[in-house]
């Protein structure tokens, strides 16, 4: 069985694959000061809940954008599962080519997302990942990663309003009853949720104009479903796109 781990700034996504089938998956809060032993306890409990025998794990693929946790999870895999994890980065063979100024700056999660989307939908394809930041990645028909965009995440945008505007407060990230809000809560929900849908539409339209063609737009991440419901710019939502990308990369490099 293959263990896939996507370590983000806000959440850690964990998946266990039996061949090509995702048999169990979890999402936990990222705690960048936790040690390998602490994550081991957490993972052990999750495996118990999911009925996963840790002795059956014979491979591990990790994407990490939180440098302090890279070593901790490498240690966890070596000591607990007795496997050497594949730590994905821009030098990891994926079959994609990178036509950007500094490939090393690409997050491992974006690489995994790009490969998974390209393998499933072909190219050109645009990938959106709604996380702490929202990333846009563009892959051409011949598997060339040509760039993208980064925008502040939905949560960051809402938190900034709450922290920096004295009379505003935290609100639930849900669709308001109407675009024209009747109270402060609905005003903020309209601006954040529907405004973000407009941001997505604007960037996707501009990217497709530069490509010279329309193409599939694949979204992933915790708030992907919420935004996809508000715009036709998103073609489909793939909740486990990053984990699937890690699986594909591992299979390409397992030898």
UniProtKB/Swiss-Prot annotation:
Q: Where does substrate bind?
A: 107-110, 184
Tell me its cofactors. NH4(+); K(+)
Q: Name one GO molecular function term.
A: pantothenate kinase activity
Q: Which residues bind ATP?
A: 6-13, 132
Which branch of life, at top level?
Bacteria
Q: Where in the cell is it found?
A: Cytoplasm
EC numbers, comma separated? 2.7.1.33
Entry annotated with the keyword Cytoplasm = yes
- Keywords, in A-Z order: ATP-binding, Coenzyme A biosynthesis, Cytoplasm, Kinase, Nucleotide-binding, Potassium, Transferase
What InterPro entries does UniProt report for this protein, alphabetically? ATPase_NBD, Type_III_PanK
According to UniProt, the reaction catalysed is: (R)-pantothenate + ATP = (R)-4'-phosphopantothenate + ADP + H(+)
Cofactor descriptive note: A monovalent cation. Ammonium or potassium.
- Which terms under GO biological process does the entry name? coenzyme A biosynthetic process
Q: Which residues carry out catalysis?
A: 109
Pathway terms, separated by semicolons: Cofactor biosynthesis; coenzyme A biosynthesis; CoA from (R)-pantothenate: step 1/5
Cellular component (GO) terms are: cytoplasm
- Function comment: Catalyzes the phosphorylation of pantothenate (Pan), the first step in CoA biosynthesis.
HAMAP family for the chain? Pantothen_kinase_3
Q: Which family does it belong to?
A: Belongs to the type III pantothenate kinase family.
Under the subunit heading, UniProt states: Homodimer.
**Protein name, entry field:** Type III pantothenate kinase
Q: Which organism is it from?
A: Roseiflexus sp. (strain RS-1)
